[in-house]
UniProtKB/Swiss-Prot annotation:
<dbReference type="InterPro" id="IPR016327">
    <property type="entry name" value="Alpha-defensin"/>
</dbReference>
<dbReference type="InterPro" id="IPR006081">
    <property type="entry name" value="Alpha-defensin_C"/>
</dbReference>
<keyword id="KW-0964">Secreted</keyword>
<keyword id="KW-0211">Defensin</keyword>
<dbReference type="InterPro" id="IPR002366">
    <property type="entry name" value="Alpha-defensin_N"/>
</dbReference>
<keyword id="KW-1015">Disulfide bond</keyword>
<feature type="disulfide bond">
    <location>
        <begin position="71"/>
        <end position="91"/>
    </location>
</feature>
<dbReference type="InterPro" id="IPR006080">
    <property type="entry name" value="Beta/alpha-defensin_C"/>
</dbReference>
<comment type="similarity">
    <text>Belongs to the alpha-defensin family.</text>
</comment>
<dbReference type="GO" id="GO:0042742">
    <property type="term" value="P:defense response to bacterium"/>
</dbReference>
<keyword id="KW-0044">Antibiotic</keyword>
<dbReference type="Pfam" id="PF00323">
    <property type="entry name" value="Defensin_1"/>
</dbReference>
<dbReference type="Pfam" id="PF00879">
    <property type="entry name" value="Defensin_propep"/>
</dbReference>
<comment type="function">
    <text>Probably contributes to the antimicrobial barrier function of the small bowel mucosa.</text>
</comment>
<keyword id="KW-0929">Antimicrobial</keyword>
<feature type="propeptide">
    <location>
        <begin position="20"/>
        <end position="58"/>
    </location>
</feature>
<feature type="region of interest" description="Disordered">
    <location>
        <begin position="22"/>
        <end position="54"/>
    </location>
</feature>
């Protein structure tokens, strides 16, 4: 049973890769070469718009960036960002 689940997951992954091929274009190369482009501010929103006051206080000062080279200083990794076919690290402080 575990083998069937594993094979199904691999087949689904293969279909996803074929449906979303990675293309090496000049645009992607230009994006990687520009140092100012690696730090992009991201608006992060969680849950219900009427959230509790405790949640509002803790999320009010949350600032996140999509970084290509990892998090800096007091930031910590909170996931990934995607811009086109490029994946970045979501760093929040």
């Amino acid at each position: 049973m575990k083998t069937l689940i594993l094979l199904s997951a691999l087949v689904l992954l293969a279909f996803q890769v074929q449906a979303d091929p990675i293309q090496n274009t000049d645009e992607e190369t230009k994006t990687e070469e520009q140092p100012g482009e690696e730090d992009q501010a991201v608006s992060v929103s969680f849950g219900d718009p009427e959230g509790t006051s405790l949640q509002e206080e803790s999320l009010r000062d949350l600032v996140c960036y999509c970084r290509s080279r990892g998090c800096k200083g007091r930031e910590r990794m909170n996931g990934t960002c995607r811009k086109g076919h490029l994946m970045y690290t979501l760093c929040c402080r």
